Amino acid sequence: MKFGKRLKRQIEESLPEWRDHFLNYKELKRRLNAVSSPDPAAEARFLALLHAEVDKFNAFFLEQEEDFVIRQRELQERIQSSSSAAAEMEGRVRREVVDLHGEMVLLLNYSSINYTGLAKILKKYDKRTGGVLRLPVIAGVLRQPFYATDLLSSLVRDCEAIMDAVFPSLPSPSAAAAAAARAAAEQAIFRNTVAALLTMQEVRSGSSTYGHFSLPPMTPLPDSDWLIQSVQPPPPPPPSSPLIIPT
């Protein structure tokens, strides 16, 4: 699948309030198609749009990350202060934990797919114009807040630890997370999370070579494999052996 279609699909599957914050790949391609040779004025306009897109990513990413930190802290405090909470409260906390975990995974995907879009459009620009924009621009992008996902990945793991805490009767974090997600399987956030995980896998498997512009390996999320498998159809059964009738 071409990247433009993959990005369009991912935007459609994202949370409605997130959709305006993704890369405007279509407009960047339109600007690119208007340039056929090195042109300082056209390059300046292209770079201005590119930098505006990066600023948009940074503002949205940092806002969401800060919100996640606050929500996770509040959840931890509620769990610690209500060890004998009513069943209704426990159910609400569990749903909030699942939603928070899902939104964090969506933000990891947001970082991944927007970076990939920038790298691809810059590669197209250099190929079309014979320029050398990609290397210096990507070097700057690698230092941008939206690309720095260490804190976010840590929050995901902390959230998985909270899942374990709110499902004390289950034998393992994976089982706890599985039960939480099954309870939320009809929610849009669940489907969006699975779509994000699949997209991250697709993006990283799109190239067999490693280079300066490659995404870092996807940090494994301990409970993501079963999440993906839970909505994928089972593999077809092996073909049966032909019936041999003795003569």
Curated annotation (Swiss-Prot):
Homo- and heterodimers with SPX3. Residues 232-241 have a biased composition (Pro residues). Pfam families: SPX. This is SPX domain-containing protein 5. It comes from Oryza sativa subsp. japonica (Rice). Keywords: Cytoplasm, Nucleus. Residues 1-139 form the SPX domain. It is found in: Nucleus; Cytoplasm. The gene is SPX5. Predominantly expressed in roots. Expressed in root epidermis, exodermis and the sclerenchymal layer. Under Pi starvation, also detected in mesophyll and phloem in the vascular bundles.
